[in-house]
Amino acid sequence: MGRVPVPRSDSVRVAVRVRPFSQREKNSGSQCVISMHSGNISIRDPKNEERVKTFTFDLTYWSHDGFQKDEDGVLIPSDPASKFAGQSDVFHDIGRGILDSAWRGYNATLLAYGQTGSGKSYSMIGFGTNKGLIPRVCEELFQAIEKQKENLEPQVMFSMLEIYNEQIRDLLSRTKAPGGLRVREDQQLGFFVEGLKWVPCENYAQIEKLVEQGSKIRMTASTNMNASSSRSHMLIAIQFKQVFLDTALTKRSSINMVDLAGSERQRSSGSEGDRLREGSRVNLSLTSLGNVISALADLAMGKKVLHIPYRDSVLTKLLQSALGGNSRTTLIAALSPADICYEETLSTLRYAERAKKVRNRAVINTCPLARASRAENALLLGFRGAGAAEHPACFWAEQQLGNQGTWAQLLEQARREWEEQYEALTQEQKMVRILPHLLNVNEDPQLTGVLKFFIHNGSCDVGRAASNAICLQGLGISDKHASFVNLDGKVTVAPHSKCKVIVNGVPVTGRTKLQHLDRIILGSNSAFLYVGFPSERGAEDLSRFDYDFFQLERAAAEGVSVATLGCVSPGDDQADPSILAVFQDYVKLMPLVVEANQMSEELKKGLTMELKVKNLASSDSRGYDLQKEVMVKVTKQGTHEVWIWSKAKFINRKFLMEELYQRFLESRDSHVAQEDDPFWDPLEVVHLGSAHVWLQPLAHCMMLEEQVEFLNCDGLEEAVLHIRITPCSPEGWAHGEEDMVIDPLELLGKRIDFQTHIVRCLGVKWLKEDGSRGIQMGYGIYDLPNTLYTKPVWKSVNPRIEETVHFAALGASREFLDYLLTNALIVDLWGLQEGCAPLGVSQLDVLLTGEGHIMVDTKTFSSVKDVSQITSNQVPELYQKLLKLEQETELLRDVNRALRGENVFLKASLENAGSAPQAQKLDNPEGATRTAAREAKQVCAQQASSDAQLARALKVFYQGMGVARGQLLRLRRCRPPEDDQMLRPFVHQQSQMLKDLEDLLESSLHKLKADVAFIVKKRKEYLLPSQQ
């Protein structure tokens, strides 16, 4: 009887869990961007609240709020209406499913994924009385074993390993194999770890002590190798075998529970622009896991997949059966609800969504046993013969255990080891109650408090040397680093020589008295909480003194806080999420920079690294703050060479530095080729600061001449810029006061010429620090596609530049005038170093006038490369002018209609003149008749003359419009020559034709207005005397 022939197809089950705010997030005033409704989880973009993304998963757990502690410290819902999900809820859904699969003979795998600090370890291991999935699964397994019938013999084997930098460390072995344990492959078994220690267990207490022992070894290894646990994967494996004594059948199940490394490492290591971005192996496992999941998801969607990259990393080799193979797999994605973690949380959700599509093919693992093999020794050794290949599960048991003895012997050996550990643990607990001691504090909460160093009466030395009372390996720890003295009920600490000791965030140089719960950092980043004498202790909550507390205290002591970064405006309690994220980055990178500096010192690389906040005091051309980001300034000691690394690039280099440093510790060899050295980069230009020159005077045709400070990223003066901007004629003659305009709209549609003249740069600190350096300046204006740079100037603290550039806006738009009124010209100062290439710009995308001046306000032009678009883009603007002229023509037609009305009135008056009073006719009948006839003739003649004049004016105007329309049609039909050499003359010709057309339109309209005004005036002059 073998495996079930028909495997069961199961999708990977995906659960998501949202944790409460961390203390750091609370201090920063973070906002929650996640919501859950009916199994759906939504995340809102803090920069655009209308952008909401919704995901659906198998299980969702809201653990963010709505909870309280019971009398045992267990977190429970605060009221019946609370949707809070505690550890017991997670175990009920996930843990019991794992146990059910194990009892039925299926392999089961649990993966915890998420960024560092998102709550992965809390869900897997738990904290205090809030036990996580791993201890609950193990405890429930043994509780169920105790209830089983007599004819079943269960066997439980336990192992615990860590994967860091593609090396496997056995966390249950006190000896470290050089280069780590090896992964082997067998055609029947698949991948397995050769030499991994498997410990037989007969109760949960043994597993609990093994986890504690493994955590202690992991913490010690992390300190010795300077390898943060957040960058390693921890895998706990349980081999559970059920031997049915009455049916000669064995069921076997592998339970793998994996706490993956922080997922943010995967994204950060892909530093854009870093020549060594593919060099680090620290992140290879997590990247490969993502590639495997993506390939399997594509396969499940019916896409053609040629290869599943299981072999790309150690982790994916060991998880091959868990992903797409023989296992029932659950992935729990841990999420931070804070707005400052939005990008990482969204990335985790997308990762989990892909994993949901992966399908496994789980089978029940069974193996037949001969009746003669029911004895314990035959159980482990009975398949050495030819039948072993037919029953790989049993053969695996032989490989792992056969050479170690029978099951009973293995249990006895494990029992003796456990008793020794229990005795040592009991002794340690006694000392904790009576002696002051140091508790380690780690970035991983599960490793905090694992190490305890006791301070006995008298002097107690700390350092690398084995002769010290406290032997501490770690970055920046000297052989004799510091001394703790326990005397007369007081404990003091004093650093040796120049060794680094920090107490409560402040470096100390002399003997310092310690108080209960003081925070101590030895070397680069070995953090400890001092626990005083029993009389000093109370019912304190030590959990609040976590890794974040240490780093925030350290940052505050160095003058870095939310307020110094400008996160909160005066009188405004709402913090900017993007700036809060910068503060979080700064605090996270602080210990990494300290460690990198220490590695540089020990490896004799001669580099000094310091954190900076880019754009801390910088603003854009309108005066608004630019987006801030953390960067690392790297300086070479002696030569004063400088590099600026982005956050992502620094993190990537830090990984590579750790690999080189680890090799140095193992072999004392730190040699590496220059191109592969993470401490080296080719020289490059360095941004020193920016100066703002406000352009408002230019909008009024006024010259401005200023001396403006270049401010660096810290807001301090780097140099002073002397610049002059002068409005001028197309020929370059400066305008005088008589050309000044009060209203900038007077310049609308007109040509504006001006010159920028950079005179000199004064007091350049960059050049004061090293006389061999040089500088360049660069600036752009309005819609200019490229930045213009001055020529390089070397070895002068007050360099004269004397560079002038002539700009022209051929028809100033409203937007350009608004730009001049409200914006500044930003001039950037760049530092040059010997051996680096100066900055330059291509002139291909710059449009020039016929005089050779640089054109701005050219939004209607696409580029010289596509000159055919120039005319077509200009056409709508010309049609707008024609439309305006037609409207004015319609107005003149209204005037014409009014004049015709007056004409009718005059004719009526003439008729009335024929019916004058009879008395007047009798007195002088002949004279009256002649006078009336003469007046009528004059009125008619004047009317005819006015109509004729108006008709002629309109005729002339419409003739002009006909010419204008003809020119417009020619412009539309005209196409540029294919010869590139003829492009510039063609553009000039087109510009001249447009100018001629504009002049024609304006002159035609002006003449029409003048003619009509003259006609109206003459009509009024004649009508007024005739009406009197």
From Swiss-Prot:
Recorded superkingdom: Eukaryota
InterPro entries for this protein: FHA_dom (IPR000253), Kinesin-like_KIF1-typ (IPR022140), Kinesin_motor_CS (IPR019821), Kinesin_motor_dom (IPR001752), Kinesin_motor_dom_sf (IPR036961), P-loop_NTPase (IPR027417), SMAD_FHA_dom_sf (IPR008984)
Residues of the FHA domain: 460-523
SUPFAM superfamilies: P-loop containing nucleoside triphosphate hydrolases, SMAD/FHA domain
Organism, scientific name: Mus musculus
Taxonomic placement: Eukaryota, Metazoa, Chordata, Craniata, Vertebrata
Annotated GO biological process: mitochondrion organization; organelle transport along microtubule
Protein name (database record): Kinesin-like protein KIF28
UniProt entry tagged with the keyword NAD: no
Gene of this entry: Kif28
Principal location: mitochondrion
Record: residues binding ATP: G114, Q115, T116, G117, S118, G119, K120, S121
GO molecular function terms listed in the Swiss-Prot or TrEMBL record: ATP binding; microtubule binding; microtubule motor activity
UniProt-listed Gene3D superfamilies: 2.60.200.20, Kinesin motor domain (3.40.850.10)
GO CC annotation terms, alphabetical: mitochondrial membrane
Location of the protein in the cell: Mitochondrion membrane
Ranges where the Kinesin motor domain occurs: 11-358
Swiss-Prot/TrEMBL keywords: ATP-binding, Coiled coil, Membrane, Mitochondrion, Motor protein, Nucleotide-binding, Transport
Role description: Microtubule-dependent motor protein required for mitochondrion morphology and transport of mitochondria in neuronal cells.
One Pfam family linked to the record: FHA
